[in-house]
Amino acid sequence: MAQSALNEILSEGVLKVGTTGDWNPMSVRDTATNEYVGYDIDIMTQLAADMGVELEMVPTDWKTLVNGVVAGNYHMTGSASISPARLKAAGYSHSYIAVEMFPFTTDDKVGNFDGWDSINKEGVKVATTLGTSFEKMVKEWFPEAEIVVVEAPARGFQEVLSGRADVFVTSNIEGSTLLEKFPNVRQVEVDTPRAPTPIAMLLPQTDQVWINYVNSWIELKKTQGFFEEVALKWGL
């Protein structure tokens, strides 16, 4: 039987965590220093500290996020939405935060949309990033619209800001940061958000020893109010 990632981390003294660095405020790469900052980074820094090991953030992107766990490029990932597709290949920790999805556009186009159904029309361009949960969602939700798929590091919202697309869908988490950062971004008015989704860390599917360790740590930190503190710090 292969040894657990837990043994490897403790013997080598390094916890390797895959992160994309493009999900504000969860994980953001500071191009000036090449360091990562954000909610995830604070969580992982604490996990490494509690384990008594060093933290190494390993750059990845959304389309290879799961593959990196499977291949052993890192011991776990930062926050990722739980999805049936990812569950086929990787394990997850317990969830510690949840998101829900909203559509966004720009101030010059916000008058064109009223609710989810108004987006699902011929002539509407919906932008999304390859390999994200959002890509699957928009293809399912808007079969009549034109889906514009871009590859990271490009992002769906950038296509909308540049005028090459009309709408992007993202979580309340990223949406709030984009509304703050870009004055011309507007949330499309909808009756209810869609796809409320728990967020968790991706882990090697068959490594139950490591999964158990991470889950027990999450429960401990939840009880101590740690996740609430970090969420408050990052405005979540």
Segments predicted by a language model, with ranges:
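Periplasmic-binding protein-like
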Residues: 98-105, 176-219, 236
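Flexible hinge/capping segments at coil-to-helix
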Residues: 107-125
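Extracytoplasmic small-molecule ligand-binding "clamshell" domains
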Residues: 2-80, 88
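Ligand-binding clefts/hinges and TM-proximal coupling segments of bilobed small-molecule sensing domains
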Residues: 4, 133-148, 189-190, 218-236
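A structural signal for short loop-to-beta-strand junctions that line the ligand-binding cleft
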Residues: 6, 36-40, 87-99, 187-191, ...
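Short helix-initiation/N-cap motifs at beta->coil->alpha
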Residues: 41-42, 56-67, 114, 148-162, ...
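A ligand-binding cleft/hinge motif common to bilobed small-molecule-binding domains
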Residues: 63-67, 80-89, 137-140, 161-162, ...
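Alpha-to-beta junction loops
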Residues: 15-16, 51-54, 70-79, 124-125, ...
